[in-house]
């Protein structure tokens, strides 16, 4: 009788220990996952969305939003210094992915090219991107557009060819790029001279847009990125590029493969959020931070809750 009781006690203890162990496993903190972004309003907004969604799913997260420039961010990801970043599909051509120019100008083909390359070469996974092209484009003020009937790159080319007054402000990397200004000139048949341009060593479009807005040094055309937050607030018009000259840059979460294998739920955690972010939405969100001075985390949280993506 005593032996039977002893066996029963031992069985119950085993069950209890097993249950406690399972509970500990189920409640264990997942992570930590280090999230990093570039230094801009869009990086801050999208990075905070990633942080909020992961924390809501029980992940411990290390915040490195505003980590650095694109090259610094990429090196940190490749060296396992960070786990999850926000990057842009068109950048794949600079990371080593080889494809024809037409591939990078196609949203789906460009995504597939960098996705395949990084997975096979670096064990880095590109997750679902947002349908918002943050590529290099040219913008004018709406008043300039209306006065000169310029809404497209075809219109702009005709204006230049007919001797219209032009002062373009842009970055050196854009002015010398066959898929930037050189590509635009070849595709649309116009030519700008050096005295029609102000070329900066950096790509800070906030400074360029301010020059356009103020008309500094006669600037009436500026390099912009498609989702720049100041475009709506500053009453700017982006010239339509019907020939898709520059590469398409869709923002996407990019995750180290080892982390994706350890936590496979991360592959789908951000899908609904990024699919909801079209060009106008990102412009509006960026404007609240870059132009309105709102806190990026609050903007991100309000958006996620409004869309039913966060409790």
What residues fall within each predicted segment?
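C-terminal motif of bacterial Sec signal peptides marking the signal peptidase cleavage site
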Residues: 15-19
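Bacterial lipoprotein signal-peptidase II cleavage site
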Residues: 20-28
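Ligand-binding pocket segment of bilobal, Venus flytrap-like solute-binding proteins
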Residues: 83, 162-241
């Amino acid at each position: 009788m005593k032996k039977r009781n002893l066996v029963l006690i031992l069985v119950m203890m085993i069950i209890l220990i097993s249950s406690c162990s399972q509970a500990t496993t189920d409640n264990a903190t997942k992570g930590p996952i280090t999230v990093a972004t570039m230094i801009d309003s869009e990086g801050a907004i999208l990075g905070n969305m990633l942080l909020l969604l992961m924390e809501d799913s029980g992940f411990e997260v290390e915040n490195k939003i505003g980590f650095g420039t694109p090259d610094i961010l990429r090196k940190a990801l490749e060296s396992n210094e960070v786990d999850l970043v926000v990057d842009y599909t068109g950048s794949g051509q600079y990371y080593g992915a080889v494809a024809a120019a037409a591939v990078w100008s196609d949203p789906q083909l460009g995504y597939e090219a960098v996705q395949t390359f990084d997975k096979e070469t670096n064990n880095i996974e590109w997750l679902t991107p947002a349908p918002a092209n943050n590529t290099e484009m040219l913008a004018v003020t709406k008043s300039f557009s209306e006065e000169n009937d310029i809404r497209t790159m075809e219109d702009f080319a005709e204006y230049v060819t007919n001797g219209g007054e032009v002062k373009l402000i842009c970055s050196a990397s854009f002015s010398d790029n066959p898929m930037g200004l050189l590509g635009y000139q070849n595709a649309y048949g116009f030519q700008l001279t050096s005295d029609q341009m102000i070329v900066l060593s950096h790509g800070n479009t906030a400074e360029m847009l301010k020059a356009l807005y103020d008309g500094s040094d006669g600037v009436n055309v500026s390099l912009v990125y498609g989702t720049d937050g100041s475009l709506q607030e500053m009453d700017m018009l982006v010239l339509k590029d019907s020939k898709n000259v520059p590469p398409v840059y869709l923002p996407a979460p990019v995750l180290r493969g080892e982390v994706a294998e350890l936590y496979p739920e991360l592959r789908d955690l951000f899908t609904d959020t990024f699919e909801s972010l079209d060009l106008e939405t990102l412009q509006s969100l960026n404007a609240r931070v870059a132009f309105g001075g709102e806190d990026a985390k609050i903007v991100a949280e309000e958006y996620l809750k409004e869309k039913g993506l966060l409790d």
